[in-house]
């Protein structure tokens, strides 16, 4: 069975600027993959390539076994929530989902998901109100409902809790956890590291278009602690590995590439 997401020496350049410099990942089906990196590291570029919105400059990528150059085959499997999700202020949540179903030419079974999704995402009582009247949290839930409307196998989320108040952010995190519990693959990019630490099975850390660390959150913490003890990383990190956070690891590996994961092979 092919991986849910796989890339092989994936590159992307914009003129003289390199956004991705040989990305290699293999993400099993049903996994939550936390994708971290500073601004400009290549996270959004990666997601846009994997959802067929951007053409790579080189290398290969597959989603559910379908090559990203086969757009029609890939989009059957994916849902994508960009950092600024498109919502239509003058439509109601129900109208927006119906519009998306028409746009994507969804079948009857997929259209039958509209009302259950409105209920599940806590929008049933406001389903017939214009989206312009919604709070930011409600707007994000409406956008997320649209992302999963076609019942995708792989869900790409770019900063899904950005700008939300704590209660709304918790609701969105719970919804993401529920989607993962259903066996979907979730590719999650966020700057809110506790969200990744809470939800992700595996974390990949990107810097300068390269994967500089990858592993389970607890494993990354142990490896960072071992490197700190060996004097390979900065001394500002936590002295007790049980107190080390994913933020400590992220700051360490993105500022100092003396230790890293899979990218060691690709960097040569």
What is the meaning of each model-derived region?
Residues 59-70, 74:
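Conserved ABC transporter NBD signature motif
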Residues 98, 102-126:
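Conserved ABC ATPase "signature" region
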Residues 151:
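Conserved catalytic motifs of ABC-family nucleotide-binding domains
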Residues 155-159:
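Catalytic Walker B motif of ABC-type/P-loop ATPase nucleotide-binding domains
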Residues 214-215:
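ABC ATPase "signature
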